[in-house]
Amino acid sequence: MKVAFIINDLQSMDLKKDTSIFLAKEAFDRGYEVHTFNTNNLSVQEERLTAQTSKLTFPTKDQLSFNLSDNGTEDLSEFTHVINRVNPPFNKDYLYMTLLLDAYGVPCINPTKALREINEKLSILKFPEIIPSTRVTASLQTIKDMFNQGFESLVIKPLDGMGGRSIFLVHKDDKNLAVIWETITGRGKHLVIVQEYIPEAESGDNRIVIINGELLEQKLVRVPSPLDFRGNLAAGATSKVEKVTNDDKKIAQHILPFLKEHNIYFAGADILGGKLSELNITSPTCLQEINNASDINPSEVFWDGLGDS
């Protein structure tokens, strides 16, 4: 099997946590030919979509350290799978990349059409019965109205962020509300998502993982640091692995038809207090953490589901 990973920040990865390298290592150990390229390496030549790729090899059996070697130009139609691991926020080059991959029928995980059309913050609006009270707005008054309706605390997020970046927790009568609104919306120029604060977040944000339509039996619980409300590892949260609960399974059953409809092979869902807060399909993470603290190897589950075609 010949596979490629689209990764824009390969050299800056944290090998102890990175999911992309974890998946690539398993592919290499299975004898697959593993390549990598970034969004700027694409070209259309003589009716072919090509990329300047590097071969990815792992010299040590039990470590994720890797070697890169320039490989030259590859026709992307020759790859069995192309794994898109580009992190948000996205720019026009990312959009053009997805359009090219679609136009030339390159087999991508997850499908580029889904990545282009499904926003991770907005997609939860399809499941109103299982999400926190949520608004999408650029209006300061709409945020104030939520407080007037009885909410004591709100979380405000950009629509294109990741890793807890630029997320604000605001409280009723917060004197910083206006300046937070100015900062995150550009004085009303950009839409944001506003959600009721879930107090159970203090005990941890639950990341469940769905691969090939199946929920992993273990989840990652990310507990915020005492100095930060965000349950993101990139924001200093700590983590532990636990068995998924019946509530987790119910939420998975709610979103599975949506994932199948859009041919989404690999997804992560974030759950707070029994409610779905985000649905990550762009570049889901946390596989290494689950692998290291349980008897489940998610990278094996990932590649087993794709077979050896």
Question: Where are the language model's segments positioned?
Answer:
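Extreme N-terminal starter segment of soluble prokaryotic enzymes
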Residues: 1-4
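Phosphate-binding site of ATP-dependent enzymes
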Residues: 141, 150-152, 163-249, 259
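ATP-dependent carboxylate activation and anion-phosphoryl transfer catalytic cores
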Residues: 7, 12-16, 243-309
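Conserved N-proximal alpha/beta basic substrate-recognition cap immediately N-terminal to
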Residues: 11-12, 17-136
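Rossmann-like NAD(P)H-binding beta-loop-alpha module
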Residues: 131-151
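Short glycine-rich anion-binding loops that position phosphate/pyrophosphate groups of nucleotides
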Residues: 87-89, 159-161, 284
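Short, well-ordered coil/turn residues at beta-beta hairpins
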Residues: 6, 84-86, 158
